[in-house]
Each structure stands twice: as structure tokens, then as C-alpha cells.
Amino acid sequence: IEEITELLDIAPLLSRHPFDLSGGEQQKCAIAKIMLSEPRILLLDEPTKGFDAHSKQNLSEILKKLKARGITVVTVTHDIEFAAENADRCGLFFDGEIISSATPNEFFGGNSFYTTAAGRISRFVFKNAVTVEQVVEMCKRSGKND
């Protein structure tokens, strides 16, 4: 329990009533509870629903820690920005089947409709830049700072 508490940074929440926790804090506690069973695969359905930017960043850090421990995380989400920043692979379900699957850069970079805001803004300048961080890095490398 102590290891998971530290991993998810929830020690300050342990003495609080669940009804007094924010949505993001409840989500972290739910992940902690699941982690007690030592899963090899974690299935998350819309994990960022109702999250603010700070909570999404916290969840992103948690997912990276889980990945570093060898845990596979499968996420179903409509949060394209979150998927582009955190996924190793992205897929599109339609009529019960995966009709497209690729790395985030290939998936979102080559897509006109299902893409990120950064991808839409930069598509005619940088090929396959789908996150803000990628656009900033490409601007720095190309000298396009304006």
C-alpha cells in the first residue's frame, strides 16, 4: 500500500473522506485501488472526463510511471490531445472494429478530421507535428520563432 501511495502521490488524501475529494483525486484513488491487485493490464474508460489541465498532467505522469513498471494501459478516450501526448499507439473504432491504427504522429498527423489543435495549426508548416511540444521543438530547430 505504501509503494502505491507513493507512486500515485496520494498520501495526503488517505485521511480524507471520499466525498471531500475532487474528481481528479477520486480518479487517482481509484487507480491506486486497482493497483493493489497488481494488474499487468489496466483498462481506462474516458479517464480525463471532467479533468482540468492540471489533473490531466497528473494523470499523464501516473501513466508514465505505470508504463515504466511494465504495466500495459489501454485507454478509451475522446480526448485527442491527451491521446496524442500519452499513447504509444492510437486506434479508431467504427462499427465494432478497429479501422485504423498507428503511432500518434502517424495517426493524428495524417488525419484531417481526427487530429489535434497543434496538428491543425502547424500542418502546412511541419509534417506530423501533433503536440504543442513537437511544434515548439520544430520551430526551434527550423529557426521559426515568430
Where are these regions (language model features)?
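A short, surface-exposed alpha-helical micro-motif characterized by mixed small hydrophobic
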Residues: 83-85
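Conserved ABC ATPase signature
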Residues: 17-21, 25
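H-loop/switch region of ABC-family ATPase nucleotide-binding domains
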Residues: 77-78
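ABC ATPase nucleotide-binding domains
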Residues: 114-146
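Conserved ABC ATPase "signature" region
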Residues: 1-13
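Catalytic Walker B motif of ABC-type/P-loop ATPase nucleotide-binding domains
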Residues: 42-45
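Conserved beta-strand-loop-alpha-helix hinge in the C-terminal portion
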Residues: 97-121
